[in-house]
Amino acid sequence: MEALPNKENQCVVNTDTFVSMTDEISSVMESIPASYSKTICEHMKRLGCTIEDLSFESGLTIRTINRHRSSETLKPSLASVVALCIGLKLHPIFSFDLIAKAGHRMSSSREDTAYSMVLMTMVNMDIVEINKYLIAVGVKTL
């Protein structure tokens, strides 16, 4: 995102950047599968992410990731879905899509609010730092 200073020395975001991002995100959203497990596989493929990379970035075991990737009947915990989103460094739009496909709906609870904060503002942070934040706000770690 390109921010340009205006004459009052305030940063103004270039609208063209948002148009481009909207086009890109919309294109991906139209092409990803309807199922939870297939959506994970598609994001991994699209991002060039291996299972080993995802395990390292998310803190989830390879076995757990494989279950998420292969089971259409899995009822994953919200924490594990959020961990996958963090591991894949998904844009919040993709994260909330994956959460919905996993059968979850974010509420106004403290836990869901903390997870939403993570997905919207901390997605590029290390999982260890994210877990420190979650501990600080009294929420289950990823």
Task: Report the location of each language-model feature.
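Long, compositionally biased
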Residues: 86-88, 112-142
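Short, charged recognition helix plus adjacent turn
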Residues: 1-13, 96-125
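Short, basic-rich loop-to-helix N-cap that marks the start of a DNA-contacting helix
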Residues: 72-86
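Recognition helix of helix-turn-helix/homeodomain-like DNA-binding domains
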Residues: 59-76, 101
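A short, Lys/Arg-rich alpha-helix, primarily the initiator
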Residues: 17-53, 127-142
